[in-house]
Amino acid sequence: PNAKDIYLIGDFNNWQMKPEYRMKKVKRFNGTWEIELKPKAMKHGDLYKLKIIWEGGEGERIPSYANRVVQDEVTKIFSAQVWAPEKPYHFRKKVFRAKTDPLMIYECHVGMSQQEEKVGTYNEFRENVLPRVAAAGYNCIQVMAIQEHPYYGSFGYHVSNFFAPSSRFGTPEELKQLIDEAHRMGIAVIMDIVHSHAVKNENEGLGNFAGDPNQYFYPGGRREHPAWDSLCFDYGKNEVLHFLLSNCKYWMEEFRFDGFRFDGVTSMLYHDHGLG
């Protein structure tokens, strides 16, 4: 709602603010902008961002609902990426019911679940780790660090892009294949989801999305978490609740996660963030 003007920029228009890519403000909705594009105006793999202009400033931002975000290997800059493969993944396991008597949970991190000194992938986890998890008698995995995050050392807890599976580990199709294979083995997949806070980063995340540092977060002293160096969502705003609840729905419907482990619940419930 704080934006004065928004342009869609990317590979398709040489990252320039062009009239045909200028977005329109929807008057009947507070703070909603839209754009109608010609067919094939954007293609699979194109990088893009929003150029947002506000009173006294401007900035390039990744859309909050972007479902694919990648980092340039040279510049290290993150951008949203159009993800519309010609052959999207189709789940083979149509119906899955987790065994919960008892539920044996194996907590894991895709990037760290391998022997080599590198970041592991969705495919490597599916091929090498899932069989060992099943052989050990577990019937559920709790997967960490799925949502995109700029700092790998945060273990995935400083999330910047809530709808984007981390591209460090591979593609969305490869994550879907991992979950599908787990279900085929009788293993439920729980996502370690982060809705208690967000990374401070402005260029990659939601920290100052349109010149309003409080658009998604509490104002004043409650905005920053005193221990995590991150920003706290304002759950009193319907728009924030819609954003987070739709995020849960997205992961369950698009990727078929079976449930969630919500990180930092005490911080969501208590004014002192559960720190005492």
Protein language model features and the residues they cover:
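Substrate-binding/active-site clefts of carbohydrate-active enzymes
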Residues: 94-99, 109-276
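Short, Lys/Arg-rich amphipathic segments at extreme N-termini
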Residues: 1, 10, 216-217
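The feature marks proteins involved in alpha-glucan
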Residues: 1, 18-107, 112-117, 124
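Short, well-structured beta-strand segments within conserved domains
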Residues: 8, 46-48, 183
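Beta-strand-rich binding/interaction modules
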Residues: 4-21
